[in-house]
């Protein structure tokens, strides 16, 4: 009986180790279910004197949960952005090759911003653009397509250094209207 108990304990520990290592290798993804407002923050150029207006709401339609970012982006007063951002847990995207996002919108161009351990100043980020359509689409962007915001940053992003991801309406006067059903790393 004692030998059987030890064998079961060893098997149980092996299963725990295998499942925890598998879980550690899963990459971050968010489908905006289960209190997304605790993971995502909205802010605009008003933090630096700009006058862009916007908001983010979380909802669902036809069984699909999503974040909905709307607003007016204005470049007056050296502004020009509204943004939805999420902090990325350390080591949760170490093996990532890129970012994917399931979106629909108003036909405008939007941006993904990644901040890393090396983006120390508020205006530093890595950026990639995508166009929205009125139908749901999944856009995949390799990390190699992200462009640094300045020469002080490394040319290439190391996945293990990623600290946050942002979805941004940026850079020109326009109306923003974007729904995001899922975002993650691949």
What are these regions (language model features)?
Residues 1-3, 20-23:
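Intrinsic low-complexity, intrinsically disordered segments enriched in polar/basic residues
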Residues 10-20:
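Bacterial N-terminal signal peptides
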Residues 2-12:
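Bacterial N-terminal signal peptides that target proteins for export
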Residues 22-186:
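Beta-rich carbohydrate-recognition modules and glycan-binding surfaces
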